[in-house]
Swiss-Prot record:
Modified residues (Phosphoserine): 22, 71
Activity regulation details: The YPT7 guanine nucleotide-exchange factor (GEF) activity of the MON1-CCZ1 complex is autoinhibited by the N-terminal disordered region of MON1. Inhibited by phosphorylation by YCK3.
Encoding gene (name): MON1
InterPro entries (alphabetical): FUZ/MON1/HPS1_longin_1 (IPR043972), FUZ/MON1/HPS1_longin_2 (IPR043971), FUZ/MON1/HPS1_longin_3 (IPR043970), Mon1 (IPR004353)
Chain's role: In complex with CCZ1, is required for multiple vacuole delivery pathways including the cytoplasm to vacuole transport (Cvt), autophagy, pexophagy and endocytosis. The MON1-CCZ1 complex acts at the fusion of vesicles with the vacuole, through its regulation of the SNARE complex during the coordinated priming and docking stages of fusion, and particularly at the stage of tethering/docking.
PTM field: Phosphorylated by YCK3; this modification inhibits the YPT7 guanine nucleotide-exchange activity of the MON1-CCZ1 complex, possibly by preventing recruitment by RAB5 homologs.
Main location: membrane
Keywords, ordered alphabetically: Autophagy, Endosome, Membrane, Phosphoprotein, Protein transport, Transport, Vacuole
GO biological process assignments: autophagosome maturation; autophagy; cytoplasm to vacuole targeting by the Cvt pathway; late endosome to vacuole transport via multivesicular body sorting pathway; macroautophagy; protein targeting to vacuolar membrane; protein targeting to vacuole; vesicle docking
Identification of the protein by name: Vacuolar fusion protein MON1
Region (Disordered): 64-85
Low complexity biased stretches: 64-79
Amino acid sequence: MNLNESYLDAEIPKGQLKHSKSGNFEGIPIVATTSEPTTSVNLDETFFKKAPIAMPICDDHSVSKSTSVNSLNTTSLASRRSPLQTKKLQAKNNLLSADLAKSNDDTTRALNSPKKDFGPYLDSENDIRSRLAESIYSMETSIRGSELQRRPYVSNEIPNVFKFSKFNSNCKLNESQTLCDKNFFIFTSAGKPIYCMHGKDEQIMSYTGLVNTVISYFQVNGPSELKTISTLTSGKRLTFLDKSPILLMAQSERGESSNELLNQLDFLYSYILSSLSERQLLRLFSKRENFDLRNYLESTDFENLDEICSLICNRMFPDLLLNSLQCLPFNHSSRLKLQNVVLQQLEKRQDIPRGTLLYGLIIAPQNKLCCVLRPRGHTLHTTDLHLLFCLISHQFQNLDETQELWVPICFPKFNSSGFLYCYIKFLPNDTHSNEKSALVLISAQKDAFFSLKSFSDELIIKLEEEKLLKKINTSKGFKLSDIPAPMVHHFIYKSKQNVQYVMPHFEVNSNIALDSSQGLEYELKLKTYYQQLHGTVVRDNGNLLSRSMLNFVRWSSKDNEDLAMDETQMDFSELDEYIIGNSSFKQESVNMVGMAWVTPTFELYLIGNNGIVDKRVLFKSARKVANWCQKHESRLFISDGAVF
């Protein structure tokens, strides 16, 4: 792939960086900031051993500013210590200084040795290259046996530079809306509340009257409808979507564009239509303008709205941002075999007239599209598929493989005035996993249940005979370590032709589960990085700035102060252990660089490891990612599907 490197800006001034020899690591420089003693590759003593600097503690027990120990007001603490405690602390400090000095001598002796000795960590430069090529992951021999296991040699967490992320993680559904940095409101043109993500009816009644007044004013006096109100000081943005007799409003302090918020509101409105249909909705309000729609909706509708809002706000959900589907990476020959089996089974069924089956889908766990059965020249809109996936994962996931559903669903982008009927059945799974794949057959005929059920039963038996069902359940996609692209923390690759995207597995630390609060916080951080990256290549109306562009975004923190500790909550023995055990304890500095690369055929959004600030290094890894995705395009994406 020939690339025009004129995209790249000028190199970062040399005074800010320190490069390794140009011949090492296939021309990739190791970047190290001059203000920090560790390399910014964050290899955690895997490649280079950091020598802590011994800093003596002053006589007045105050810590020197140049040391990496937390800046504590130890003068006031010393006044409260007894002479015995002070003497014990001085003895420990003397031992610490001696140990650190010895460590410095050992490290200096190793670095000045004429031999290329990399210590007990690596034996040669080849080891460095091979492990660096695996990004932040390496192979390690298991202690219990010879089986190789992948584990992160370093923490692959990314720093949090967004203040609202931690703030919003404590904001639960139906909590007071004043405590949250993002909220959704749905109400009628007459001011009747329908739904609010945070807050109760009493709390939002004041909003409805104000919003109706403002919207009505612009409808009468303005040249166009009101879409957004932004505040310059607080950064709060109010975005409106008028779908009379339904009005929707999003309140956000996250820096999202108007187009992003409008797409999210449209998705919520599409869900309401999927449950009612536009024709039925208009008929209800034509009889009475102040009709209370809450009395017509089911309790499951509000539960689904809660889940969708939580997915949009707090989870990594690039589907709406990129307006595309996530596809299950699957072996190309196995995918072709799967599509042929589906077509052959459909051709055998003479009792299913042409036009009875409109679409067929096999949806893998985590809402990843695996197979599509469709008529030639027709496809479903991504919004309709997103709604279907959300219903399956949130409302129907508790069903087992012996149960089946026949559900009327309105696909608003396909036909907002009518319903299609979906036969939904979860596929057998022998992998002892709670996540299940689903088979969905869509028809326009409400009496086609038994014919589609018979087709489904025969298809599942055939999939089990061909061992395709097991492959679907065990296919887990790919990891970042499968791609020879160093310095990359995470990426999203979108194929424009297929309107699909792929991304590697979330590989958080082994002691953090993705469904835990720390895992959710990680998803929210990653989501916000991508949101800001995407915002650099699109206009406020959602259109791309150009068909080809390359943008870099840098997040940095100039305030790299040492972590503070509350001295009122720490006794003297804890302070002694803290100083001895944390002589190099310092808050991680934020120095992140992300890249948004748009071409006529693909979009690539990539986040580098913290500390990698050389844009040419990151772009070289991005080219490897793009080449790898294009090389494995038949495995990563569904090009046509099973067409009949």
